[in-house]
UniProtKB/Swiss-Prot annotation:
Homodimer. Interacts with FliD and FlhC. Its main location: cytoplasm. The gene is fliT. It holds the Pfam family FliT. Residues 1-50 are annotated as: Required for homodimerization. It comes from Escherichia coli O8 (strain IAI1). Keywords: Bacterial flagellum biogenesis, Chaperone, Cytoplasm, Repressor, Transcription, Transcription regulation. Residues 60-98 are annotated as: FliD binding. Dual-function protein that regulates the transcription of class 2 flagellar operons and that also acts as an export chaperone for the filament-capping protein FliD. As a transcriptional regulator, acts as an anti-FlhDC factor; it directly binds FlhC, thus inhibiting the binding of the FlhC/FlhD complex to class 2 promoters, resulting in decreased expression of class 2 flagellar operons. As a chaperone, effects FliD transition to the membrane by preventing its premature polymerization, and by directing it to the export apparatus. This is Flagellar protein FliT. One of its GO terms (biological process) is bacterial-type flagellum organization. Transmembrane segments: none annotated. Belongs to the FliT family.
Length: 121
């Protein structure tokens, strides 16, 4: 059985999933990106299974090489965008912790605003 057409199609599908993930990351659609990750992983596993059964010919490898480069480039860009997002979230968590500390330190004042007394009388 010739797996070459099926393998090539599987790689094309992986490229499409990779491009979708890059678009979602670029558009900061983080929930959708996470949701699409499982389909990407499944596509990678399918390719691994297909290449385990029958190793692709040298000609097929040459045809697949540009797709692999594109997928790796997309993955690198997605990782960069995710790192930027993680840095943003870390900053927000840090700010939230500071606010919580301030509220904890000054929030037990019984609802009163403390002001210096005027002792000039």
């Amino acid at each position: 059985m010739n797996h070459a057409p099926h393998l090539y199609f599987a790689w094309q599908q992986l490229v499409e999933k990779s491009q979708l993930m890059l678009r979602l990351a670029t558009e900061e659609q983080w929930d959708e990106l996470i949701a699409s990750e499982m389909a990407y992983v499944n596509a990678v596993q399918e390719i691994a299974h297909l290449t385990e059964e029958v190793a692709p010919s040298t000609t097929m490898q040459e045809q697949l090489r540009p797709m692999l480069r594109l997928i790796l480039d997309n993955e690198s860009k997605v990782k960069q965008l995710l790192q930027i997002r993680m840095d943003e979230l870390a900053k927000l968590v840090g700010q939230s912790s500071v606010q919580k500390s301030v509220l904890s330190a000054y929030g037990d004042q019984g609802g009163f605003v403390l002001a210096p007394q005027d002792n000039f009388s």
